[in-house]
Amino acid sequence: SGNSYGEICFNTGMTGYQEIFTDPSYHGQLMVTTNSHIGNYGILNQEAQSQKVNISGLICKNFSYEFSRPGASSLYEYLKANQIIAISDIDTRAVVNYIRENGAMNAVISTQIKSIDKIEKELKDFPKMEGLELASKVSTKKSYLIGNPDSKYKVAVIDLGIKKNILNNLINKGFYIQVYPYDTEFSEIQKWSPHGYFISNG
């Protein structure tokens, strides 16, 4: 329960909701999922794309409290632990069509505000995502090394909100990687003498 604000966006994936929710690219956004069922295969920690849930709220058609995958845990408990508000029984395809026709906009999920006028006022006061500096909220705070230290090639990764799968793909290519915070000076990165540089999405 509570209020959750953010830019409303959507994802049409049939699976992978945990990866979507933990993707730093979606930081602070309200996620609309067009897949009919969300939560039916639970949550596995190893499938998270970052250390936290990045969406600010979930809007879905059917939310499943039951799940059927060995070793998984409840999406409901996962969202509750991360203080993420979700709303279900929504015609998400109609919402997606509205977003497509009207463009990016802020929205709110609320269990507390009963006045439409108050909701409209608070939405008007909520900052638009365009132009916001968000890299500092999703980037690593300290540099770290991953991969094979005996690799022939070293790659410096600038973290603007990188997903775990991108790092895994670089590691699978055989690179030794050092991940740097978004605001690291180039001269500091050069001290490691990397063979290549990778600037993440975010």
Where are these predicted regions, by residue range?
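RNA-binding accessory domains that recognize and position tRNA/RNA substrates
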Residues: 1-187, 191-192
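Glycine-rich beta-strand-to-loop/alpha-helix junction loops that act as flexible
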Residues: 199-202
